[in-house]
């Protein structure tokens, strides 16, 4: 099955990226701030690409766009009531779904490789976040979702920027690896 071989190759490439990023961190040639900058850039570009390529010229196309974004909306709703480790799972799923909206497979591979580097740090921060910090983060996710629905790149980019400059983001400045 050719499709299966394609998935195998994509997974191998993703693991290779992850290995390179891990080695850079291990050798102190990179740091968590640079990883976060890459994640932020991937998400901003994914948002822009999704908005730019969305066909909303007809009512049917608009309905299709809303259906494409529905998983993001459901994730945001679930996030509102989440606690503990469920926060981590939903946050990760939201970021993965955001990247998927771009339909850029390379972005998805890079996002997965980069996110794997900081899973533990993010898990520690999200599970320890106060309810107020968590709700601020959920509000960022809601704004990102709404900006995609409304095709408002400026609002979406501002929300992504805010997401990565949260009050508890300083807690993430811990060594990785």
Question: Can you say where each PLM-predicted feature lies in the sequence?
Answer:
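Residue-level detector of well-ordered alpha-helical segments, enriched
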Residues: 34, 38, 42, 64, ...
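Short loop-to-helix capping motifs
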Residues: 103-105, 151-152
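Short basic (Lys/Arg) and small-residue
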Residues: 98
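Amphipathic alpha-helical segments enriched in hydrophobic/aromatic residues interleaved with Lys/Arg
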Residues: 57-81
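C-terminal all-alpha effector/ligand-binding and dimerization domain
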Residues: 69-76, 89, 115-177
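Short linear motifs at protein or domain termini
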Residues: 1-42, 48, 52, 176-177
């Amino acid at each position: 099955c050719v499709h299966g071989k394609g998935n195998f190759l994509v997974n191998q490439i993703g693991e290779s990226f992850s290995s390179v990023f891990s080695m850079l961190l291990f050798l102190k040639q990179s740091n968590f701030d640079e990883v976060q900058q890459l994640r932020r850039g991937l998400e901003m570009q994914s948002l822009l690409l999704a908005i730019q390529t969305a066909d909303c010229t007809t009512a049917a196309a608009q309905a299709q766009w809303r259906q494409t974004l529905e998983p993001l909306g459901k994730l945001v709703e679930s996030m509102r009531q989440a606690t503990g480790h469920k926060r981590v799972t939903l946050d990760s799923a939201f970021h993965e779904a955001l990247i998927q909206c771009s339909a850029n497979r390379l972005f998805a591979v890079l996002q997965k490789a980069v996110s794997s580097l900081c899973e533990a740090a993010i898990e520690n921060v999200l599970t320890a976040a106060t309810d107020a910090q968590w709700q601020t983060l959920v509000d960022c996710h809601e704004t990102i979702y709404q900006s995609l629905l409304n095709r408002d790149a400026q609002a979406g980019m501002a929300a992504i920027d805010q997401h990565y400059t949260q009050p508890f983001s300083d807690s993430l400045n811990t060594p990785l690896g």
